[in-house]
Amino acid sequence: MSKIAKTAIISPKAEINKGVEIGEFCVIGDGVKLDEGVKLHNNVTLQGHTFIGKNTEIFPFAVLGTQPQDLKYKGEYSELIIGEDNLIREFCMINPGTEGGIKKTLIGDKNLLMAYVHVAHDCVIGSHCILANGVTLAGHIEIGDYVNIGGLTAIHQFVRIAKGCMIAGKSALGKDVPPYCTVEGNRAFIRGLNRHRMRQLLESKDIDFIHVLYKRLFRPVPSLRESAKLELEEHANNPFVKEICSFILESSRGVAYKSSEYSSEEKQEE
């Protein structure tokens, strides 16, 4: 049975499943759908075509599904889809998609979005990610699974961050980050590998292989793209080569890499 505060304002067109808790002074619009076990603390606002998955918990003064902050948006149909078991903390803002993007913003399962996180239109966030306080994502950003982003970090539109990456706090990131890398700075560049996350997800032999692979990729000569092509040709059946090198070759913004930065950090870790 759902538990709904008397002061909540809920559209009769909204869909509320069983076991949902809605706190005082929440506002829920026409196109909102809340799956089983969703919990809204007081003063949460949900608008637009917004779907919230099972057991997701949203804290006070979060605003989800309101009109994108994009001057090109003209009221077209778009969605915000959030998966299961997410924690969305105080004052987060998450916008739906736009006609100029994929028409939806997507967030996976088991993520933690800390206070004051902003997720702009057409972003795609995987599962098991942590976005610390004050992280700001511009539009059209793609984030893979198991990514950690430190507080007060700003990320440029259309940037892609692959699986298992770590973005240090107070960074400004304008380029793509391939799998399992750590980046830091303004502008942020790759400093080394996210070995903590790799040890959680991979076997030791695979970590060693990826370490050597990045050493080959990040040599001064040939270029990063040429190195990625060569690796794919020579190790086409290796899943890590395919994952990492394909990501590099598909990058439209370029990779956040400087040879001097990566080399110095890796030497410290070794």
Swiss-Prot record:
Compartmental location: Cytoplasm
Looking at the UniProt record for this protein, which Gene Ontology cellular component terms does it annotate, in alphabetical order? cytoplasm; membrane
SUPFAM superfamilies the record matches: Trimeric LpxA-like enzymes (SSF51161)
Q: Which PROSITE patterns match?
A: HEXAPEP_TRANSFERASES
Q: Which cysteines are joined by disulfide bonds?
A: none
Task: State if Lyase is listed as a keyword.
Answer: no
- Quickly give the catalysed reaction: a (3R)-hydroxyacyl-[ACP] + UDP-N-acetyl-alpha-D-glucosamine = a UDP-3-O-[(3R)-3-hydroxyacyl]-N-acetyl-alpha-D-glucosamine + holo-[ACP]
Its function, per the record, reads: Involved in the biosynthesis of lipid A, a phosphorylated glycolipid that anchors the lipopolysaccharide to the outer membrane of the cell.
The UniProt entry's sequence similarity note says: Belongs to the transferase hexapeptide repeat family. LpxA subfamily.
* NCBIfam families (UniProt xref): lipid_A_lpxA, PRK05289.1
The name on file for this protein is Acyl-[acyl-carrier-protein]--UDP-N-acetylglucosamine O-acyltransferase
Q: Which organism is it from?
A: Helicobacter pylori (strain HPAG1)
Recite the lineage of the species. Answer: Bacteria, Pseudomonadati, Campylobacterota, Epsilonproteobacteria, Campylobacterales
